[in-house]
Structures are given as C-alpha cells and as structure tokens.
C-alpha cells in the first residue's frame, strides 16, 4: 500500500512538472520570432537595378555582385536576351530579380500608341521564356515612365497586360558620367541618404555597361558598410514609379 502511494505521488509530481518543461522552449521560440520580426522591420533594405542588359559586360557585373554577395534586379531588352543567352540564363540561375525593358528602347516606337508598349513587353517576355524558361510581370519603360507613359497607356500595360511598373528614386547617372566614377559614386550615396531620411526604401538605377563595372565595387562596399541589405524586386513588392501607381 505504501509502495502504491509513493508511486502515485511520484507520478503526480511528474505530471505537474511536465508542462513546465516546455515553457522555456516556448518562451525562447516566441522571443526569437519577435526578435526576427523586429530585425526585419528595422533592416535597411535597398534595391539595386540594372537597365539595358544583358550585354557583353554582364558576366563581369555578375562576378562583382557575387563577390559582394549582392542580389540585383535586371530590366532586360528582348533582343539582348536572345543575343546574350548565357548571361540571361546565369542571371536567372543565380537568383537575381527579373524585369523587362521592352524591345526597341526607342521612345518614338515604344510610346507610339497605347498598345505598342504592351506589345514590346509581351515580346520581351517571350524572349525571356524562350531563353531561360521563365516569365516576369515586372517592367521598366524606356527612359522612365514620365512623361511618356500617359494614363491610357498605363491602363493598357498594367490593366490588360497585368504588369507592375517600376521606375527609381536614386539615379546614378552612370550613363552620363562614364568617365567620372567619383561623380557616379557621389550621386548614389547622396541620393540614398536623402531617400532614406524621407523614410523611403532606395531603388537605385544603374546600367549594364562597362563603365559601371569601374564604380560598382566602391558603391557596394560603401552601402554594405552602412548596413544595407540588398534584395530583389518581385511582384509582391509595392512598385515605386513616377506616377505613384501601385498596381
């Protein structure tokens, strides 16, 4: 009888203590989850984008990005994707963001009508699919969407076409200052700081060209030193464009 009482007492004690064994684990998991969420909310996110590629210089550009463990988003031209197929495939394989930049890059042709731009983006998407087996809904129109992309044009591209329009809020002007790398660097850093002060996430415009390769390492090193995390654009990221069109 005494043995039975001792057994019951021991069993009862174990049952009472059993839930307590999980409290520290649960509390730790909750705290870790909260810390992770807070860290993400406070993260300094930046989006680096490249227009006009792929080109003969894309391989070196990708090497630099890989060296600094950075992902970017490429807004590519249809004919260039077909001409530089290995570069296109590598962009996809290495997990960079994918965007379309049309076919002609000629304002008089792309913006000729409300449907000419849509046709170019659809054609560019077919080129991407043909070369790399994927498609994208992200677009950046030639020379930016303002003032060319009138409301009716946007409704066709974003409404009927189902595309998401991206411009930028940090212009490196690397196409203009091809030999003045310090100017390009200063443009990026000053504008990034200004945009961040406004509480906005920086979207940096650069170009897939030889001159950009000279300044890119300096830019990446500086931004990483300031704690920026480079992420890619996706359909789930709210678009930044000159019309404030969130479609």
What are these regions (language model features)?
Residues 20-40:
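Sec-dependent signal peptide cleavage junction
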Residues 72, 98, 164-165, 230:
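Hydrophobic beta-strand scaffold residues
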Residues 16, 81, 170:
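Hydrophobic pocket-lining residues within nucleotide cofactor-binding pockets
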Residues 1-15:
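Bacterial N-terminal signal peptides that target proteins for export
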Residues 33-131, 135, 222:
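Active-site beta->alpha N-cap acidic-glycine motif
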Residues 105-224, 228, 236, 243:
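Catalytic domains of cell-wall/extracellular-matrix polysaccharide-remodeling enzymes
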Residues 16, 20-21, 213:
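Hydrophobic alpha-helical transmembrane segments of integral membrane proteins
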Residues 36, 40, 68-72, 80-82, ...:
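C-terminal domain-boundary segment and adjacent tail
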């Amino acid at each position: 009888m005494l043995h039975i009482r001792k057994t019951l007492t021991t069993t009862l004690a174990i049952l009472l203590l059993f839930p307590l064994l999980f409290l520290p684990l649960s509390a730790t998991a909750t705290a870790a989850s909260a810390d992770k969420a807070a860290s993400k909310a406070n993260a300094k996110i930046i989006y680096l984008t490249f227009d006009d590629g792929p080109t003969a210089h894309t391989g070196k550009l990708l090497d630099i990005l890989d060296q600094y463990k950075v992902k970017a988003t490429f807004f590519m031209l249809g004919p260039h994707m077909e001409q530089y197929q290995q570069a296109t495939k590598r962009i996809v394989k290495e997990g960079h963001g994918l965007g379309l930049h049309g076919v002609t890059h000629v304002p008089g042709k792309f913006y000729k009508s409300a449907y000419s731009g849509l046709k170019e983006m659809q054609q560019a998407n077919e080129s991407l699919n043909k070369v790399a087996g994927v498609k994208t809904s992200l677009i950046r129109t030639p020379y930016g969407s303002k003032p060319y992309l009138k409301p009716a044009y946007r409704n066709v591209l974003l409404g009927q076409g189902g595309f998401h329009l991206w411009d930028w809020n940090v212009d490196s002007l690397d196409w203009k200052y091809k030999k003045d790398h310090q100017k390009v660097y200063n443009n990026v850093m000053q504008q990034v700081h200004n945009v961040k002060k406004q509480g906005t996430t920086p979207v940096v415009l650069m170009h897939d060209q030889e001159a950009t390769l000279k300044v890119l390492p300096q830019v990446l090193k500086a931004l990483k030193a300031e704690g920026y995390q480079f992420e890619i654009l996706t359909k789930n990221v709210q678009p930044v464009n000159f019309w404030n069109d969130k479609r």
